[in-house]
A protein has these predicted regions:
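Active-site-adjacent core segments of small-molecule enzymes
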Residues: 1-219
Length: 219
C-alpha cells in the first residue's frame, strides 16, 4: 500500500544472450538525465540523521526537476497505489533502438497492458487495506495464480522512424514524456501470462538480477 512506483521487469532468454527489459508500472520516470540518478536515489533514501524517509529531502530534489511533474501525477493519482499487481500496466519507459543486419533502425517502446484492467486505491482505501493485510499485493497475486486465475498482459509496441523525431513539439527520447497513442499507434505483438509460482524461489527469484544494460544483438 506504499505510494510509490512499482517495478515491472522481464528477462528474455535468447540464443544470443539475455535481455532484461526493466521498467515501471508508469510510462514515464522522474528524471531525463542519467547523471541525476544518484542524486534522485539519495533524496529518496532515509535521512542520515534519523534513518526515516524525509519528504523535505524528496521534494527539495524534485522541485528542482520540473520534468518530474508528469511522473508525480501518476504516483499521486490512484495508480500510485495499485489495487493489485494484476491490475497495473507495465512499461519499458525508454525508447529502444532496434536495428537489422543492414544497420537500419527504428525507435521502439514496449507497453504491457493489463487484461485485468488498471485499478488503484485512493488514500482512504489504501489505509483500510493496509490495516487489514500489509502484504495484500503479494497475497492477491499468489492466491490468483494458485487458483488458476492467471493474470495476463498484452504486449504492445510503438514504433517511430528516426526521421520523425523532429516532427513533435517534445523530445520523443525523453523518458519523462509519453508517446501519445494518437500520434504513435500501438501494435499488439504478444501476451504475457503468469501461469505458475516459482518452483525454486532461490534460483528463480533471489538469484535473478535484472540490469538495464543487458541487451542482445538487434537492440
Amino acid at each position: 500500500t506504499l505510494r510509490d512506483p512499482h517495478g515491472f521487469a522481464l528477462k528474455f532468454y535468447t540464443q544470443e544472450g539475455n535481455w532484461d527489459l526493466v521498467g515501471n508500472q508508469t510510462p514515464v520516470f522522474f528524471i531525463k538525465d542519467a547523471i541525476k540518478f544518484p542524486d534522485f536515489i539519495h533524496a529518496m533514501k532515509p535521512s542520515p540523521i534519523n534513518n526515516v524517509q524525509d519528504a523535505n529531502r524528496v521534494f527539495d530534489f524534485l522541485s528542482s526537476q520540473p520534468w518530474a511533474t508528469n511522473m508525480l501525477t501518476y504516483v499521486y493519482g490512484n495508480q500510485g497505489v495499485p489495487t493489485s499487481y494484476r491490475e497495473q500496466d507495465g512499461f519499458g519507459v525508454h525508447a529502444f533502438k532496434l536495428y537489422n543486419d543492414k544497420g537500419e533502425y527504428k525507435y521502439v517502446k514496449f507497453n504491457f497492458r493489463s487484461k485485468q484492467g488498471v485499478k488503484g486505491l485512493n488514500v482512504k482505501q489504501a489505509a483500510e487495506q493496509q490495516a487489514k493485510d500489509f502484504n495484500h499485493l503479494t497475497n492477491d497475486l499468489y492466491k490468483n495464480i494458485n487458483a488458476g486465475n492467471f493474470p495476463k498482459w498484452d504486449l504492445y509496441i510503438q514504433v517511430m522512424d528516426p526521421k520523425d523525431l523532429n516532427s513533435f513539439d517534445f523530445d520523443p527520447l525523453d523518458p519523462t514524456k509519453i508517446w501519445p497513442t494518437d500520434l504513435v499507434k500501438e501494435t499488439k505483438v504478444g501476451t504475457l501470462t503468469l501461469n505458475r509460482m516459482p518452483k525454486n524461489f532461490f534460483q528463480e527469484t533471489e538469484q535473478v538480477a535484472l540490469a538495464p544494460g543487458n541487451l542482445v544483438p538487434g537492440i
